[in-house]
Amino acid sequence: MKRMKRVVAIAAAAAMTASVMTGCGKSGGNEPAANHGGASGEVVSVDFWTAPQQVQYNFWESKAQAFNEAGITVDGKKIEVKVQQMPESPSSEAGIQNAIATGTVPAVSENINRGFAATLAASGAVYDLSGETWFTDVIEARKMEDTITNWAIDGKQYVLPVYVNPMIWQWNMKALKALGFDSAPKTVAEFTAVITEFAAQRDTTMKEMGVTHSFYRPSLTRPDQWWDRWYDFQMPYEALTGGKPWVEGNKLVLDKEGAVEAFELIGLFGNSIQSGEISSIWTEANPSVLVTINAPWEISLYRENNKVYGEDYIYGQAIVKNDGDIPYNFADSKGLVFYKNKSITDEEHAGAVEFVKWVYNKENSAQTDLDWLNATTMLPVRGDLNDNEIFADVMKEYPELAALAEAVPYA
């Protein structure tokens, strides 16, 4: 979510879509290939694309149904929102770029990270929301005044953030305690002590518990999953450098000393890294690793398998040099954008804005974000998750979410 712009990833997505754009033009030269929303009588149909995930589709479909039933109009015409999942292959970014090129892009979609938004903004494909009163109102309602600054692109705002997943360490609590530690390490010295003790007890206590490896990270040996360095490299890199970026615009500005320190931290695992694929390591009766990168979207799965936060696993902050240093971390965070395209009428754009305004206005935003949290177990981008009473019950029920929320300000 922070300053890093995924230049290489976006370039790759663009290259992949280039070969398919030719065969996806408008049928007959005048009409879009897909059935694009538009004004019909006194109804304006607005297309909304969700992430290619069923749980997110279900959430937005329920919001669209409620909005449609409310009978909201613009200039006397009723707005109806139609929801569908965006294309997933070869990537959602490629699907959006193809839709832009072929005039089949929706009026609005979710699932846009800041890096891809920068690419879209540079090509004039999305609206700048900075001067919109409704956008400012939403930021205020969600207490996002500090967070939104990290989403700025050349001083402008093109994305309404929806959710944030801080990527931090997820520790095997039972294994930690067996090694003699009551909490997750915070500093390099504490981290080193834990890994050193693991190595000393690997063939004894750990073997008896079924903990065979220190770190689960199969993507480390897979060149085709290079993007996972955002998680296993950037998280320690940001924490150890005080939040320094490693890409600014199209320029690599990697801090050499910080990069070496991040690799040295990962190197402490030595030959005890589990690089083989395991479908869901944390749902095993006895997880076979000491630590992984967390996966917030799996919280419900853990609960279904009777895993208890604080007993079976615990989140640990990004590792810092010294006690008291800010634990900056990478975050998987995405939001909404409104598309500019000749196939999208002014009425459709206005209708899309009305829908998003209704979902996130002062009266609805807290309930919307609570519904999102309950549906996805992914943290909504808000500045009051641990303070707003409406979230108190779910945070009490899900202490793991409350723990993740503490990492949001540093993402």
Regions found by a protein language model. Name each.
Residues 1-46:
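Short, low-complexity disordered leader/linker segments with a strong preference
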Residues 112-167, 207-210, 230-231, 310-319, ...:
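Hinge/lid segment of periplasmic solute-binding proteins
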Residues 73-143, 177-186, 288-291, 306-308:
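Extracytoplasmic "Venus flytrap"/periplasmic binding protein-like
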Residues 195-196, 243-277:
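Glycine-centered hinge/linker elements that transmit conformational signals in sensory
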Residues 146, 150, 316-318, 370-411:
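Long, aromatic- and glycine/proline-rich binding clefts that accommodate carbohydrate-like moieties
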Residues 75-77, 178-179, 260, 264, ...:
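Extracytoplasmic/periplasmic substrate-recognition and gating elements
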Residues 152-162, 167, 192-251:
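Extracytoplasmic/periplasmic solute-binding protein
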Residues 53-78, 170:
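Short, polar/charged alpha-helical segment
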